Amino acid sequence: MKKKYKIDTNIFSKELLGFWLYLMSDCIIFCTLFSVYFILVDNVAQGPSGHNIFQNNLIIIETFLLLFSSFSCNLVLFEMKNKNLYMVFLWLGITFLLGLLFVFLELFEFFHLINLGFGPTRSGFLSSFFVLIATHGIHVISGLIWIIVMIKYVYTFNITNLIYYRMLCLNLFWHFLDIVWVFIFSFVYLFGMV
């Protein structure tokens, strides 16, 4: 006889407290990196500033990729509640592909800037810019690895409370990365273009 279970959807449950604390520590890291960036933004050492190097089209595409991946990541939880395995795999795959495209565009931007001679050693501004964007990119890559692990878990164990809980943590992490990206987009790229 198949065991019935009810999925707990409370994002403020005591089981998630540790993960919320982790997200807060990540938030402190990004706040520190933003502070360093804002302190060094005018230290261009006779090199380029943001309005000289930022590419509007690339940044907008990156933003849409990450925002759409957040939407698709949310649909994974919805389909888990409905116990629709096919759609869970589909939305996890779409989230993974969108995140992977985002990372490729970030790497393209980095290599493009370095090829132009605007690497992280050029100025304080570029150092802080590269560290902030690379830290976000490393977090996105970590999220992509987590998505692969979740695909394996769901494939192996089906949908259980533990799998749902892990997916909920991934979802919170992915949304956190989106929020950080919105800040990067707004305060680094948009203000940097002015």
Swiss-Prot record:
Intervals, Extracellular compartment: 42-55, 108-126, 193-194
Family, per entry: Belongs to the cytochrome c oxidase subunit 3 family.
Any one of the GO BP annotations: aerobic electron transport chain
Chief site of localization: membrane
GO cellular component: plasma membrane
InterPro entries named in the record: Cyt_c/ubiquinol_Oxase_su3 (IPR024791), Cyt_c_oxidase-like_su3 (IPR000298), Cyt_c_oxidase_su3-like_sf (IPR035973), Cyt_c_oxidase_su3_a-hlx (IPR013833), Cyt_c_ubiqinol_oxidase_su3 (IPR014206), Ubiquinol_oxase_su3_dom (IPR033946)
UniProtKB keywords: Cell membrane, Electron transport, Membrane, Oxidoreductase, Transmembrane, Transmembrane helix, Transport
Protein name, UniProt field: Cytochrome bo(3) ubiquinol oxidase subunit 3
Subunit structure, interactors included: Heterooctamer of two A chains, two B chains, two C chains and two D chains.
Coiled coil: none
Localization, UniProt: Cell membrane
Segments on the Cytoplasmic face: 1-18, 79-84, 150-169
Pfam families tied to this protein: COX3
Membrane topology field: Multi-pass membrane protein
